[in-house]
């Protein structure tokens, strides 16, 4: 069994049918899935994107907002999601802490890896917000970095599909699921598991990545217990 994992959710996942903002029903569902991991003795870290609030690349597209500023706006979006997730976890009776890569002490702790490790020892879920704290880096890269820093045995990317495909399954009915694939193939074939920086960082640190459908109840627990039938593994 994987003892410590980091789960990465997209910001869009929180938006639900509206496509923006936060759907509390989805938030509650995710918190319940995380609770099942904690109840099975798993130490859990979470990273959430900010696409339901604002996407840096999109905000900077027409040049009115500089890319660096747009990326910082995106980081703030991830903190909004982190605060919401912390509340949802506590609503379920779990203890949670939000740590951010940009200091904002009134609402979150600054990211300190040793402090995060102490939280795990005390059974707390740790949410990492504000990405890496630097523009031009995605939240996927931030998740990979944090997973490496805390010594996670696996990074789980919770998405809308049950794994990695050779082409977009939403567009191509004949898309083939890849049960396992190497970091090198993901990079060379441009298979969009995560961005190239995140994949390269995972490769350098031998961090396996599981890609699964977050909407199938129990998938996260199956994966941490070693059942990879409902996911794809990049290693």
From Swiss-Prot:
Similarity annotation: Belongs to the UMP kinase family.
Catalytic activity: UMP + ATP = UDP + ADP
EC number: 2.7.4.22
Root EC class: transferase
Binding site for ATP: 8-11, 51, 55, 159, 165, 168
Pathway(s) the chain acts in: Pyrimidine metabolism; CTP biosynthesis via de novo pathway; UDP from UMP (UMPK route): step 1/1
UniProt cross-references to SUPFAM superfamilies, sorted A to Z: Carbamate kinase-like
Designated name of the protein: Uridylate kinase
Region (Involved in allosteric activation by GTP), start-end ranges: 16-21
Lineage: Bacteria, Pseudomonadati, Campylobacterota, Epsilonproteobacteria, Campylobacterales
